A protein has these predicted regions:
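Alpha-helical bundle segments that constitute or directly flank the non-heme di-iron/ferroxidase center
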Residues: 1-29, 50-61, 134-138
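Short coil/turn segments at secondary-structure junctions
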Residues: 1-2, 43, 80-90, 127
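A short secondary-structure junction motif
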Residues: 21, 25-28, 66, 110-113, ...
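Acidic/histidine-rich alpha-helical segments that form the ligand environment
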Residues: 10-15, 79-116, 132, 136
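Solvent-exposed interaction patches of small proteins and small membrane subunits
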Residues: 2, 6-9, 33, 68, ...
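Glycine-rich, flexible loop/turn motifs
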Residues: 26, 35, 69, 80, ...
Length: 157
């Protein structure tokens, strides 16, 4: 099995790990922030549901020409202030599943050369399609870890 096959498989199955984790968070904790400026499990989930669109756009950009510039994605001040708490969770998770399935199908069609295609990233020393989607997986697992921390947190005072 190649590295790309393993990566695609992990991306394909990630929603099956993350969504049940989100559903396990008790309703009274779901939107509760652990401290000022830190996201709730709900916000982490909404954020994850929005990520594939940006990474799909980056893929299209990288494949469109030689070494395009990839800008760092920053969270909006509105999101940091709690705007994601107003987004419908069920609709967002449905979107996450749909967009992930579409993204996975697109990734399965990439050639070995396309996986290695490089871009210039403003924050990283080197960047390729493979690195980008490995980064997406790591990003998801980071947020899943944060959700699990909030799920299991004992001391909420």
């Amino acid at each position: 099995m190649s590295d790309t096959t393993i990566l695609i498989s992990a991306l394909e199955t990630a929603p099956g790990v993350i969504i049940p984790l989100i559903r396990e968070v008790p309703a009274d904790r779901l939107k509760r922030r652990p401290s000022e400026g830190k996201w709730s499990a709900y916000e982490h989930a909404i954020h994850l549901s929005q990520s594939d669109v940006a990474f799909r756009a980056r893929l299209d950009l990288i494949l469109s020409g030689p070494e395009p510039l990839i800008k760092t994605i920053e969270n909006s001040p509105e999101d940091e202030a709690g705007a994601m708490l107003e987004v419908d969770l069920d609709a967002s998770l449905d979107r996450y599943v749909r967009e992930r399935a579409s993204l996975v199908e697109r990734l399965k069609q990439l050639s070995p050369d396309e996986w290695q295609k490089e871009a210039v990233h403003e924050a990283f020393d080197h960047y390729s399609v493979f690195i980008m989607f490995r980064h997406l997986l790591n990003h998801e697992m980071f947020h899943a870890y944060r959700i699990e921390e909030l799920l299991l947190k004992k001391d909420w005072d």
